[in-house]
C-alpha cells in the first residue's frame, strides 16, 4: 500500500520533573502526554537510566591494569575507561581519544554508551539500561496501567467516565532512544536501543517498487527512524525527554513484539569486523 498522503507528527511532552532512581517513569509520562490509539512514545535513554538507578559515581570504578594502559594511550580518566570495559564485551577501536566497543547488549558505539552530560551531580556517569527492550516493555505497561487506573489521564481529547474508560485504552508503542555516531558520516543520530509494541523493521523484500521492480534487500528501520524524527523537536538542553510520534499506527502492535534486538545485524553478516 502506498504511503502517499500520510502525515507524521512529533509532539514534545513538556513538564517532566527531574527523574530519580525508583521513579514510576511511565506513570509520570502518562500524566503529561496526550495519547491516542496508535501513538508511539520516544523516550530518551538517559531518563530511563535515571529511573532505573543507572547513574553512578565515577569513583565507584577501580581501574585495572588494562584500563590504566588504555587511559594513558587515549588521555581518558582511568576510572571511566574501567567502566567502559565493564560494560563492554569487546573493544573494537582505541585511538584518537576514542574508544569504540561492543556492549553486552550488542551495540557498537563510543564509550559503551556511557555519558556524563545532563546529570544533576558532578562526578557521576550514566550507564545504558541493563536491558533496554525489557525497559521499554515495562514503560509500556506502566503507561497503560496509569491510563487504566485514572480516567482521563493520558487520553487525547477525552474526558471519559470510569465505565467507558476501559474501552478507550489506547494501544501504544514505546521506543527508548540514544544518540549514536555513524562510522562514515559526521554528527550523531538517534537510534532505538529498546522498543515495545512496535514492528521495528518494515521488510520490503519481495515487494515491488513504484516501477514494478522486485526489491531484494530493502528493510526500513522503523524504530530508528521514529527515534530520529522525535529528536528533531527536542534539543539536548531542553529537558524534554519524551516525544509522542503520531502517524505510525500501522506499525504499532497489540503485543510487545521482538524489540529493538531485531535491528542488530548478526555477526556472521557483518562485513566490517
Q: How should these model regions be labeled?
A:
Residues 3-66:
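N-terminal, positively charged regions that mediate nucleic acid binding
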Residues 20-33, 130-150:
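Phosphate-interacting basic helix/loop segments used at nucleotide- and nucleic-acid interfaces
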Residues 17-21, 25, 39, 124-131, ...:
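Catalytic cores of large soluble enzymes that bind and process phosphate-bearing ligands
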Residues 107-142, 146:
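Intrinsically disordered, low-complexity linker/loop segments enriched in Gly/Pro
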Amino acid at each position: 500500500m502506498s504511503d502517499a498522503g500520510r502525515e507524521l507528527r512529533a509532539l514534545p511532552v513538556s513538564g517532566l520533573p527531574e527523574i530519580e532512581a525508583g521513579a514510576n517513569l511511565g506513570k509520570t509520562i502518562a500524566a503529561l502526554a496526550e495519547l491516542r490509539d496508535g501513538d508511539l512514545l520516544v523516550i530518551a535513554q538517559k531518563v530511563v537510566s535515571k529511573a532505573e538507578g543507572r547513574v553512578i559515581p565515577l569513583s565507584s570504578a577501580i581501574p585495572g591494569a588494562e584500563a590504566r594502559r588504555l587511559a594513558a594511550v587515549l588521555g581518558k580518566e582511568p576510572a571511566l575507561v574501567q567502566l567502559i570495559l565493564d560494560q563492554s564485551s569487546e573493544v573494537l577501536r582505541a585511538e584518537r581519544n576514542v574508544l569504540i566497543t561492543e556492549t553486552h547488549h550488542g551495540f557498537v558505539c563510543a564509550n559503551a554508551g556511557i555519558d556524563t552530560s545532563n546529570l544533576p551531580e558532578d562526578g557521576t556517569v550514566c550507564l545504558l539500561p541493563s536491558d533496554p527492550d525489557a525497559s521499554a516493555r515495562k514503560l509500556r505497561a506502566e503507561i497503560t496501567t496509569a491510563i487504566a487506573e485514572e480516567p482521563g489521564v493520558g487520553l487525547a481529547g477525552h474526558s471519559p467516565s470510569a465505565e467507558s474508560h476501559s474501552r478507550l485504552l489506547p494501544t501504544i508503542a514505546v521506543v527508548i532512544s540514544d544518540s549514536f555516531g555513524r562510522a562514515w558520516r559526521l554528527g550523531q543520530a538517534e537510534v532505538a536501543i529498546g522498543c515495545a509494541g512496535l514492528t521495528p523493521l518494515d521488510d520490503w523484500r519481495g515487494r515491488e517498487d513504484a516501477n514494478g521492480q522486485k526489491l531484494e534487500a530493502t528493510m526500513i528501520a522503523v524504530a530508528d527512524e521514529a527515534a530520529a524524527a522525535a529528536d528533531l523537536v527536542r534539543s539536548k538542553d531542553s529537558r524534554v525527554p519524551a516525544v509522542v510520534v503520531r502517524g505510525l499506527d500501522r506499525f504499532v502492535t497489540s503485543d510487545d513484539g521482538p524489540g529493538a534486538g531485531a535491528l542488530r545485524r548478526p555477526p556472521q553478516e557483518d562485513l566490517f569486523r
